[in-house]
């Protein structure tokens, strides 16, 4: 065996014996880098496209809802197979891990192809549904058409990166994602301005970057750099495995799916006021997503640790992993909230030098900062249930923030408060999600981790 490739038993020993803080930090750093790079190149799209016009900037927010749909299925299938893989490796069932990874990879690519076909066939009504006004529509159609063509590659990449993370090889996962993200940032100004492609150039830069990430991740598997194998011979013919992958990943599908729904509802609610309102909430959401990506990156370091140790029967280390993640995530959120609260105008001006966009976006950022420190706890309670295979509760928790709690707020608050109601809806949902998560965490620790 080459020296650079760690054996499954060595990896198992690392996951079960390394001190929890050191282990989670070591796994979180590459996942954080991956998350931040992903958000960074999405934010780069917003930054460069905002230089075109306010309507073009708003179109990025509209198409973000579509990208959330693609991510819902790709990331959901990836998280589903990742949870099964980490628990399988923890219990020394490597054959099941190979079968799960291979089946999930080809399944995700097929789902991405279906999304591509369905989206292209219904593009104009889909863009209207997601919040495009007549002035935003030409930009959103141009952007979405190219993004849809990349959907199969995007979905498959999510499975490959989650497979690497689930076996504890978060650093390898980071390489592919970061390379694609950095390429995206380099190509954006080239395609948008130098080649005069406008918003279509931003979409093409994103699609090509996703393809590069996929090729790099696939290379790692083809050259034996992973513990888990992905091969057509390992594809399962048993429908039950696909059902289990979807069942475990369903909380993520719900969470991301509701993120798409909430984004569409937010765009439609803001569009009542102006394109500037849509652009403002798009930019403020990108900033909020940047912080959330840090929280999720820590959680992606936490999940394989919890899965391995719970699968091996070590409840104490599972508890320690949860609380360390909560403390780390909360500290990060407090720092980010403080920085954003001090410089809201400067942040909005960075993206779009428009007084109306800044005025609306500033208030949205301040509302978000008020509840930001609660984000880590509710996120990790949800991830705890999901990575340990408690599907129904995980699905319920995942549906709260962007669905069960958010949808009523975005439908009611704007009618009562006007534009401030639009800005307060997501922070309100975050606060309520924290309250709902408390009894779930207390029950789980008393009955499953005692």
Protein language model features and the residues they cover:
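Short runs within selected transmembrane alpha-helices of multi-pass transporters and secretion channels
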Residues: 78, 147-165, 173-181, 202-217, ...
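Hydrophobic transmembrane alpha-helices of multi-pass small-molecule transporters
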Residues: 69-72, 184-189, 214-218, 290-293, ...
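Helix-terminus/linker motif at the lipid-water interface of multi-pass membrane proteins
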Residues: 36, 40-58, 127-134, 190-197, ...
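Transmembrane helical elements of multi-pass membrane transporters/channels
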Residues: 25-45, 146, 180, 209-213, ...
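Small-residue-rich hydrophobic transmembrane alpha-helices
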Residues: 57-117, 154-173, 267, 280-344, ...
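Short alpha-helical transmembrane segments in multi-pass integral membrane proteins
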Residues: 1-31, 85-152, 194-250, 306-371, ...
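Membrane-helix interface/capping residues of multi-pass secondary transporters
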Residues: 46, 54-57, 94, 123, ...
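Hydrophobic/aromatic residues in alpha-helical transmembrane segments
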Residues: 29, 45, 81-82, 122-123, ...
């Amino acid at each position: 065996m080459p020296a650079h490739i760690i054996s499954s038993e060595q990896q198992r020993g690392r996951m079960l014996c390394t001190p929890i803080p050191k282990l989670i930090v070591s796994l979180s750093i590459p996942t954080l880098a991956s998350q931040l790079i992903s958000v960074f190149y999405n934010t780069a799209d917003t930054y460069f496209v905002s230089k075109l016009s306010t309507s073009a900037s708003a179109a990025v927010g509209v198409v973000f809802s579509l990208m959330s749909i693609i991510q819902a299925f790709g990331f959901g299938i990836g998280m589903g197979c990742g949870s099964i893989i980490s628990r399988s490796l923890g219990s020394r069932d490597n054959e099941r891990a190979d079968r799960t990874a291979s089946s999930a990879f080809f399944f995700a690519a097929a789902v991405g192809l279906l999304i591509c076909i369905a989206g292209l066939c219904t593009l104009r009504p889909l863009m209207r549904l997601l919040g495009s006004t007549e002035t935003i529509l030409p930009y959103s159609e141009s952007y979405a058409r190219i993004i849809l063509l990349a959907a199969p590659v995007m979905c498959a990449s999510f499975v490959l990166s989650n497979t690497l993370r689930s076996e504890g090889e978060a650093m390898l996962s980071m390489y592919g994602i970061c390379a694609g993200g950095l390429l995206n940032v380099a190509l954006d100004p080239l395609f948008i301005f130098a080649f005069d492609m406008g918003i279509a150039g931003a979409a093409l830069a994103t699609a090509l970057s996703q393809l590069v990430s996929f090729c790099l991740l696939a290379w790692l598997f083809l050259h034996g750099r992973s513990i888990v194998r992905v091969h057509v011979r390992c594809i399962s013919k048993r429908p039950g495995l696909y059902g289990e992958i979807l069942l475990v990943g369903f909380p993520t599908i719900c969470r991301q799916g509701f993120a798409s729904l909430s984004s569409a509802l937010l765009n439609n609610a803001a569009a009542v006021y102006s394109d500037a309102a849509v652009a403002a909430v798009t930019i403020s959401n990108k900033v909020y997503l940047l912080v959330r990506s840090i929280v999720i990156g820590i959680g992606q370091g936490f999940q394989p640790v919890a899965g391995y140790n719970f699968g091996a029967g070590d409840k104490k280390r599972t508890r320690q992993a949860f609380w360390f993640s909560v403390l780390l995530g909360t500290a990060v959120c407090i720092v980010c909230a403080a920085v954003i609260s001090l410089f809201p105008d400067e942040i909005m001006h960075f993206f779009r030098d428009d007084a109306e966009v800044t005025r609306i976006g500033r208030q949205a950022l301040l509302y978000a900062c008020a509840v930001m420190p609660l984000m880590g706890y509710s996120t990790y309670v949800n991830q705890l249930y999901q990575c340990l295979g408690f599907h129904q509760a995980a699905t319920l928790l995942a549906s709260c923030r962007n669905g069960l709690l958010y949808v009523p707020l975005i439908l009611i608050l704007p009618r009562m408060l006007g534009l401030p109601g639009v800005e307060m809806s997501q922070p309100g949902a975050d606060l309520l999600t924290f309250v709902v998560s408390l009894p779930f965490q207390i029950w789980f620790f008393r009955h499953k981790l005692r």
